[in-house]
């Protein structure tokens, strides 16, 4: 109603883009074309001619396949064989010793290690569970290789957001989120303002560099629209 475009920028690489559109639509938020995922950022580092080992969920698998690259899903193709140009990692519940071993072999063979995000945990109604970043960290430890991280708060995700907002000055953008270590850092990567929502993840605004601090998303909107 205010004439402001809203992008939903998420480190969720597990759900497909359509699933994320549907989830937002179910709560009355039409968002088709306005969702940016860490899976989308991960594939910006992939070439269509590559052979890619995917250690991730269906959202990441879908995005890798869409590039045209030969896509091998690590837990669907055992035993994994041959060489790879990249290993792309995201949250998935199938992670086990064999996935770690296959990723190790591929990376040691020269594959580029790409992490969709470095979030250590993933929120659920029953509390946090290990996130995609924990899986990336395990593969980094095993291989001795530092992954290229593409999601928030890193540069590839920022580049993707800029591409989706042609003609928009970053000085006019506001990153809204509840974590300074990802959302605030992403705002700094983009070079835009940061609005911190005190949702419980960050209980107060102390020691956080934010342009706006509010107890809720509605509070952020009110401050942004108040002259």
Regions found by a protein language model. Give the residues of each.
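N-terminal phosphate-binding loop and flanking beta/alpha elements of the actin-like ATPase fold
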Residues: 5
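Asp-based, Mg2+/Mn2+-dependent phosphohydrolase catalytic module
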Residues: 2, 12-34, 39-227
